[in-house]
A protein has these predicted regions:
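A generic structural motif
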Residues: 195-203
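Short, hydrophobic beta-strand segments
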Residues: 31-35, 191-196
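Class II aminoacyl-tRNA synthetase-like tRNA-binding/catalytic domains
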Residues: 2-15, 19-184
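Glycine-rich, often proline-containing surface loops adjacent to acidic residues and nearby aromatics
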Residues: 25-26, 187-194
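Surface-exposed helix-capping loop/turn segments at secondary-structure junctions
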Residues: 56-62, 219-226
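Long, well-ordered alpha-helical scaffolding segments within enzyme catalytic domains
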Residues: 203-224
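Conserved small/polar residues in nucleotide/adenosyl-binding loops
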Residues: 229-236
Length: 239
């Protein structure tokens, strides 16, 4: 989408009460948006539809609503603390910072610093003491608490594999480069399902879930061709 069309879309969303720049009257906060009267209803309709099709209409999925603040050791053991990062460069000419693979044309190569890794997780402290024991993160995705609560869900529901755990919730990423309106932001919501299967049955389950999700997207008015062919080969590895 061209910059002109994006600007027109942003203006329309604000004018009709879908999305506003967060803290706009104080100059706004880059990468943060507030959903207005129509926006919150649209978002809730999408979430309710997804939850209904993923949890309520199936007998093999349980729901979860986990905490946003995440213990440091969880994200250390998951690998996020060491690898959830993007390469960052500084332009010595303009003074701006960019992802190494998204440097604008007006910055010359010789003006860039060597790339260094920038962790995308927001850090915070839990409790009144600012020391190592209180260190935590705002979760960068909704998956980790599903895994850490796996045994709790199994013990409390007597579930056996195959079954899934679904969650809708906020996630936070301190993105270096923000672009395309709400398509890359620092605070957003995810609708996530982790489905656990018996080894050797993963391909069959994958096909079933792909078809199920395509039907759901069609019910939202999105063409099956658009929702499926957008996934390129290198994007499907974790799916």
């Amino acid at each position: 989408m061209s910059a002109k069309n994006i600007d027109e879309l942003i203006a329309l969303c604000k004018r009709r009460g879908f999305i506003f720049q967060s803290s706009e009257i104080y100059g706004g906060t880059q990468g943060l948006y507030d959903y207005g009267p129509l926006g919150v209803e649209l978002k809730n309709n999408i979430k309710n539809s997804w939850w209904k099709s993923t949890v309520y209409e199936r007998d093999d999925v349980e729901g979860l609503d986990a905490a946003i603040l995440t213990k440091q050791s969880v994200l250390k053991h998951s690998g996020h603390e060491d690898t959830f990062s993007d390469p960052l460069v500084d332009c010595k000419s303009c003074g701006e910072r960019f992802r190494a693979d998204q440097v604008p044309d007006y910055c010359k190569k010789e003006d860039l610093t060597e790339p260094r890794q920038f962790n995308l997780m927001f850090k915070t402290n839990v409790g009144p003491v600012d020391d190592g024991s209180s260190f935590a993160y705002l979760r960068p995705e909704t998956a980790q608490q599903i895994f850490t609560n796996f045994k709790n869900v199994v013990d409390s529901t007597a579930r056996n594999i195959p079954f899934g755990i679904a969650q809708i919730g906020k996630a936070f990423r301190n993105e270096i480069t923000l672009k395309s309106f709400i398509f890359r932001v620092r605070e957003f919501e995810q609708m996530e399902l982790e489905f656990f299967v018996v080894p050797g049955t993963d391909e069959d389950w994958h096909k079933e879930w792909v078809e199920s999700r395509l039907v759901w997207w069609e019910n939202q008015g999105v063409s099956r061709a658009v929702s499926y062919t957008h996934l390129r080969a290198h994007e499907t590895g974790s799916y």
